[in-house]
Amino acid sequence: MGKMLKISILVIVLAFIIVAGVYVHTNYQPTETALAYLNGTRDVNVTNVTTGLFLDGPGNDTALIFYPGAKVEYTAYLPMFTQIASEGVDCYLVDMPINFAFLGVDKADSIINESNYSHYFMCGHSLGGVMAGEYVNHSSNVDGLILICSYLEKPVNVPVLSVYGSEDTVLNMNNYNKSKSMIVNNFTEYIVAGGNHAHWGDYGEQSKDSPSHITAEDQQKQGADEIIRFIKQWP
């Protein structure tokens, strides 16, 4: 191997290491509070599955499939979705390739194909919501869509719940308002007063977000209650 070729390979390897290091450094990791939920609760059993985590609560009729936000570890969302599972809606938290949902848009396919629920709802936070909407656009197996501080890029023909915080300065409101015209079925909007972008998960503060005026626990409780209310109104 020539000297110049060796140098070129070394430069490429070093560049990859630097890029990987920067990515890992800017990735949003779950807090200890979130990770404690890996042990489950009295009402919810948490298990590892091929697509991520399965939160098995007392219900057996309805499942919620969740796509996380960009660069956020899916385990960071355990607290809120454990609340939802405890109310009778089993939840799948999907582990996306390098934490970008656009690299795993169709991951819901295997969940739906390998389970036996009567009803499926898609849900996503931020970029995960955009990709959940993308999935719903070409799937006939979904009963509804929940967008958490997110918006649509393609039309959907199922009921939609949109939830976001009043202090969210990450959500692109121009895109959000434009996307409302893509909802051709029932649309429900719920704004959490004082809530921000990051506190739907437990991963700390997020770049370009504004401080929340309420606790993460309060924000997640309001969101979980509204999601349960939305799902249970559709027989």
Each model region followed by its residue ranges:
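N-terminal Sec-pathway targeting helices
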Residues: 1-17
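Short beta-strand element of the alpha/beta-hydrolase
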Residues: 61-69
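Short alpha-helix in the alpha/beta-hydrolase fold that links the catalytic acid
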Residues: 80, 171-182
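Conserved alpha/beta-hydrolase
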Residues: 81-101
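Gly/Ala-rich beta-loop-alpha elbow adjacent to hydrolase catalytic centers
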Residues: 123-132
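A conserved short beta-strand
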Residues: 141-151, 159
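Short beta-strand/loop motif that positions the catalytic acidic residue
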Residues: 162-168
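Catalytic histidine neighborhood in serine/cysteine hydrolases
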Residues: 183-208
